[in-house]
Structure formats: C-alpha cells, structure tokens
Amino acid sequence: MCCGAFGISSWRGANAVDSVVMLDVNPSLSMTVSSKERVLSVTPFNQDAEVILGDMDLTGTDLDVAVNALIGSMLQNGYLSDIQNAILVSVENQDAAKSAQLQQHLTDTINSVFQGGSLEGAVLSQTVTESADLNALAQQYGISVGKASLIQEVIAQDSTLTFASLAPLSVNEIAL
C-alpha cells in the first residue's frame, strides 16, 4: 500500500502543471509543462498558431524538443524569417527562481535554433504573473497572456498607443 501511494504521488507530480510557457511571434500559443519539463498540453490562441501546430501532438514531449519543433514550423511556414525575426518567450511559474531559470534556458535554446538556421533573431523574454485582467485581455484579443503583458508594458511607456491597435501586430512590429 505504501509503494502504491508513492507511485500515485510520483505520477501526479510528473503530470501536474508546474509552468506555463508562451511563445509569440504572431502565432500565439501556450504550453503547460510539468516539473520534469514535459509538455502536458499546447493551446493555440489564433489561426496562425493552429497552422504552426499542424498535426503535431507534442503532449509528453520534452520541452526542448517541443520548442525546437515549434520554432522549426514557424521558420518553415514563414512566420520567422530574416525580416520577421523576433519571438517573445513568456514563463509563468509560482517560483520566481524557477521561472527565471526556465526563461533563460528557453532563450538559449531558441538562440541555438536561430544560429543553426543562420537567422539573426531577437528573443525577448519575460516572466509573467497570472492576473484576471491579463487573462481577460488575452482571451478578448486571441493572444497569450505573455503578449498581453508585453502590450501593457508598451502602452505604459507610450499612452498614445492602444491595446486594440497593438494586439494584431507581430512581436517584431511591437518591438520596433
């Protein structure tokens, strides 16, 4: 009985959501990830993200493999190129240190993919904290919470901009 309880506890730990990783170019998608950095689910937030996912089933895949596959699909489908070369990586985790570590790891992974494809890309990264306001904006505009957070930061610096005008833009266009 003791071993059975331990087995169930270990299974739950390996299959519980530990982090949420969001990737935004103009395709916006989100991945829930276990503490062992396995993808539990992938949610596309717009049609472009559905194109990127295609028929890929990334559930159970190592996070690095999933990120490589998604970046590869973005390159192949023209969402990332020499002209459109910025990607936003957002990480949400209750543990700030783990969030920062995962954010840096993913930035390094994506930079390696860019270098392998001879692409001069820009990886913007941030840690986000879930809030009802951000969730509502993300849902309203069909974007990730990470992109909603970036847009709020841009608007805070330039009050002449509006959320509605920035939401449909690519990360590359927002970063300019």
Over which residues does each language-model region extend?
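Single-pass transmembrane signal-anchor helices and their membrane-water interface zones
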Residues: 1-17
